[in-house]
Amino acid sequence: ELEYRLIRESKKYGSYVKGYSTTWKEIWKGLKKDDIAIEFCTYYSNNTEEYAAVLLEKKSKYPTVVRLFSQKQLSTIPTTDYYNTTALSNLIWKPLHHYLAEKKNVYFSPSGELNNIAIEYIPLTDKKTFAEYYNTYRLSSTRELIKNKREDIRTKAVLYGGLEYERGQGDIEAMRKELQSAESLIAFRDVPEIDSLVLRKGISFLEGTEREVQTIDTLLRNKQIPVALMSGMAGTEESFKQLSGQSITLLHVATHGFYSPLTGHYTAQRSFEEQALSRSGLFLSGAAASLNMKKIPEDIEDGILTAKELSKLDLSNLNLAILSACQTGLGEIVGDGVFGLQRGFKKAGAQTLLMSLWKVDDTATQLLMAEFYKNLVSGQNKRAAFLNAQKYLRSYQNGIYDKPEYWAAFIMLDGIH
């Protein structure tokens, strides 16, 4: 009965775009002999949350369901063991070993708590991670395999970084005048270097993000890619919302991300989603005033961009969004996915996301991002550019950043081309 229910539910995948549906047969037709598509899912049995995997491979004419483990079993593994032992692989990948034989490409869509774990980077053996044995692709849904892809990122780019989170009355008045007079807050021009940026009380200034976006700005401009660099007080929520409907293909946001777990019980799905999306977001220029409970004029945004607000934008031209911030991948976990920034961006229409799952080291992030963009502008596709940047970081200065805490935080979602 369980297998029948899971297979029946797998025939129609949910979509971030209303009215879009895909059958497993369409996905199956597009698979090659050495491909396997894995849709992880959760279900309840005897009041216990259980995990299973629905597998699609070319040699099987129907989906295969494999029961995996319970949430209770998962919770017994310390998070410190995730990327240093094979304990997690024994629950997730070992039961699928038979199906992975002779496979080269593994396309998987996580569910439940697996959204918050980089399961592609967990050790499969004492020497290698899962991703070192297979070409792994993390997907928001395996339906992504049959969607049309856009690989070109050269049209326009917008970079947010080195943001000032504090703002005084003068900043607010200046912003009001700019809003009244300017047609657009996004200008594709150079932005002067911001002086006297120091560590703040509350939301701390991320000094490394200023260097990060300046480096990326130079790399892109050298390749004749139009760039708008939003730093200091320029990286406002107003400017971000003006991206909606524009032909922006590359967006880089280097700032603080936030995630606040949802408390209480919500029976209505719509209410749950709205509440959960409101608890993930990004801090943009001027956000500290709102957090410090300062009064902000009604015609000025608070600088706190929630995933809910993000989801209502039109970012359908966005080929790649890079979220270089703390905990940007996190959100409220429910059965059909994660209600966080990744949900917000996908609902807005973004194709590929590169984001972090936990607080990231500033210097390591700068190194990884700079190398990623070097690879990208040299002609590598998104996935190759990312994987090679990880390898570079791990080998940097004789491996000072080789521990997973430095490089495994970043995941690429829907990075297929």
Where are these regions (language model features)?
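Short, charge-rich amphipathic alpha-helical segments embedded
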Residues: 3-4, 119
